[in-house]
Amino acid sequence: MPSHKSFRTKQKLAKAARQNRPIPQWIRLRTGNTVHYNMKRRHWRRTKLNI
């Protein structure tokens, strides 16, 4: 990844960084909740973004 990125590439990386976080703990406490963890977590070395 070059240090001089296009704006579109930087936007995609920022979106991927926002998505790659655990769910908040208060969501797990809601009544009738079935979400236990974020299934779409991505590890930087195992799975690449292909951008």
From Swiss-Prot:
Residues 1-21 are annotated as: Disordered. GO terms for biological process: cytoplasmic translation. Belongs to the eukaryotic ribosomal protein eL39 family. The keyword Disulfide bond does not apply. Keywords: Cytoplasm, Ribonucleoprotein, Ribosomal protein. GO terms for cellular component: cytosolic large ribosomal subunit; preribosome. It comes from the Eukaryota. This is Large ribosomal subunit protein eL39. InterPro entries: Ribosomal_eL39, Ribosomal_eL39_CS, Ribosomal_eL39_dom_sf. It comes from Schizosaccharomyces pombe (strain 972 / ATCC 24843) (Fission yeast). Pfam families: Ribosomal_L39. Component of the large ribosomal subunit (LSU). Mature yeast ribosomes consist of a small (40S) and a large (60S) subunit. The 40S small subunit contains 1 molecule of ribosomal RNA (18S rRNA) and at least 33 different proteins. The large 60S subunit contains 3 rRNA molecules (25S, 5.8S and 5S rRNA) and at least 46 different proteins. eL39 interacts with yih1. It is found in: Cytoplasm. Gene3D superfamilies: Ribosomal protein L39e. Residues 1-15 have a biased composition (Basic residues). The lineage of its organism: Eukaryota, Fungi, Dikarya, Ascomycota, Taphrinomycotina. GO terms for molecular function: structural constituent of ribosome. Component of the ribosome, a large ribonucleoprotein complex responsible for the synthesis of proteins in the cell. The small ribosomal subunit (SSU) binds messenger RNAs (mRNAs) and translates the encoded message by selecting cognate aminoacyl-transfer RNA (tRNA) molecules. The large subunit (LSU) contains the ribosomal catalytic site termed the peptidyl transferase center (PTC), which catalyzes the formation of peptide bonds, thereby polymerizing the amino acids delivered by tRNAs into a polypeptide chain.
